[in-house]
């Protein structure tokens, strides 16, 4: 068993798609549009086969994204080693996005940073623990 995909509603479908393409090497499928209900979406696929569905509806209610709440709180991407976390985090910061923590080693041993995407969704960027332990397997 595996998770097939995760979906999230966004206000600016194209900007979010570009964000994940630029920083996380996502490959977008064809845009789906259902004009009758004002819905559109992209499936983004990542190198390991994981997928994220970005969805937009013209009649959405966007509430503040509290960091301390129940429900899904972030998406985490493993990007390689610590140097990769540092490099990607720095690029995201230099491009004007907010870094809310790190890069740092957490109390439970993860090397990570946490950033906000264009719409304030929390994204963790982590080092692959297998690489950090000397394994060549991702």
What are these regions (language model features)?
Residues 29-30, 54, 59-64, 132-135:
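A short, acidic/glycine-rich surface segment
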Residues 2-11, 42-45, 65-138:
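Vicinal oxygen chelate
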Residues 12-25, 59-63, 89, 121-127:
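Short N-terminal helix-initiation segments at or just after the protein's N-terminus
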Residues 9-51:
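Core segments of cupin and vicinal oxygen chelate
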């Amino acid at each position: 068993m595996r998770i097939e995909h995760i979906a999230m509603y966004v206000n600016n479908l194209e900007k979010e798609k570009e964000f994940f393409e630029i920083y996380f090497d996502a490959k977008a499928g064809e845009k789906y549009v259902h004009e009758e209900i004002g819905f559109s979406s992209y499936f983004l696929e990542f190198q390991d086969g994981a997928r994220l569905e970005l969805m937009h509806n013209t009649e959405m209610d966007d509430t503040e994204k509290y960091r301390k709440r129940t429900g899904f709180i972030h998406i985490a991407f493993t990007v390689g080693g610590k140097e990769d976390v540092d490099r990607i985090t720095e690029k995201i910061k230099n491009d004007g996005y907010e870094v809310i923590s790190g890069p740092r080693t957490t109390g439970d041993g993860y090397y990570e940073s946490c950033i906000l995407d264009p719409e304030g969704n929390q994204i963790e960027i982590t080092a692959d623990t297998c690489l950090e332990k000397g394994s060549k397997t991702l």
